[in-house]
Amino acid sequence: MRTPYLLALMVSLLPLKSMAQVAPDPLLASQIVDRYAEHIFYGSGATGMALVAIDGNQRVFASFGETRPGNNIRPQKDSLIRIASLSKLMTSEVMVKLAERGQIRLDDPLSKYAPPGARVPTYNGQPIRLINLSTHTSGLPREQPGGKAQRPVFVWPTKSERWAWLARANLKAAPGSSAAYSNLGYDLLSDALSRAAGTPYPALFQQLITRPLGMKDTTFTPSPEQCGRLMVAEKGASPCNNTLAAIGSGGVYSTPDDMGRWMQQFLNSSVNHRTPQIDRLQTLIYRRDQLNKVEGMDVPGKADALGMGWVFMGPKNGRPGIIQKTGGGGGFITYMAMVPQHNVGVFVVVTRSPLTRFTPMSDGVNNMLAELVGNQLGSPMMVQAIP
């Protein structure tokens, strides 16, 4: 009685075995990166580009163009860059780590950590909380009004100037009701974290972010030697100043190598294991449908959920769900995107020319991520965006 059943089972497995025998071997991550990186560079119209891709145990670096117009030197792993608004991800990391130490609560009101005598606006009695600052739901504007045109990036407003402005400000919406991108909010958040810890923010940043990962070139105050390595854009370049004024929102200088080290902590490999702490850093706080409106969050694609700096785009058109963050300033455009459950991530930085556009760069990175995921054995996703 068992024989027909076994024969039927064997016959049913034959096609699967046959398919397994002809299935192509997965490509090296470097082969996929090579296919996409040059297209991303030329599509973006950049002066120079550096890219770091991680796929499990594989880390790939690629670069194109020049570190400054006309010098014919490709960007290097240690070229100094501005990560711009990717700085916000590190500010949120400091916040989460202080919360784990018990030094703050994510739902603490900003007023708890305001300078003595400072006023923090509320909306019908609802306070701005730290979690609102980190999710762009504070009700504060994108920038503090009144900045001088053509000023260097990330040098205004200073700490005293933003708190003086805040004392006169009024909120137009309840915190937590809508999302509107706010650089000002993140600088106030870094001020609050420094006060809560009783430590200057640069020292806190070094203690919690850069020193544990060996990020030796990541700073707010680059040395003359580091400034000599700063990539320079054809359009929008800014002096290599200290950026302590924009310490929470966009002031971080770094290198592709340091950013690869930082990105690796979010992705499992044989030597790195994603921790529960890292899971908390990428917790999604608001679904889009929980908010009255969402402004300034859809640059590389529609934001379906917001985390603490991170933005999640759900699966679409053959692409997997992607968690990402964009940045730009001082002639730089940056983008970090990853699919953590598949241990793939990409960081890219470009310097601008008059022709530079963000979307061709981010679309190329998103397609590369999808193909890296599809290249993994057993994954159903595959994108062939470049023949």
Show where each model-derived region lies.
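Active-site SXXK
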Residues: D34-A37, L51, N57-R59, L80-D107, ...
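N-terminal signal peptide c-region/cleavage motif recognized by signal peptidases
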Residues: P15-K17
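Short, surface-exposed loop or secondary-structure junction motifs
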Residues: R68, P121-G330
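Bacterial N-terminal signal peptides that target proteins for export
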Residues: M1-L6
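Short, gly/Ser/Thr-rich active-site loops of penicillin-recognizing serine hydrolases
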Residues: R288-E295, G301, P315, R352-P387
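Short, conserved catalytic-motif segment at the N-terminal edge
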Residues: P26-I81, Q103
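Short, well-ordered beta-strand elements
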Residues: Q324-K325, I333-R352
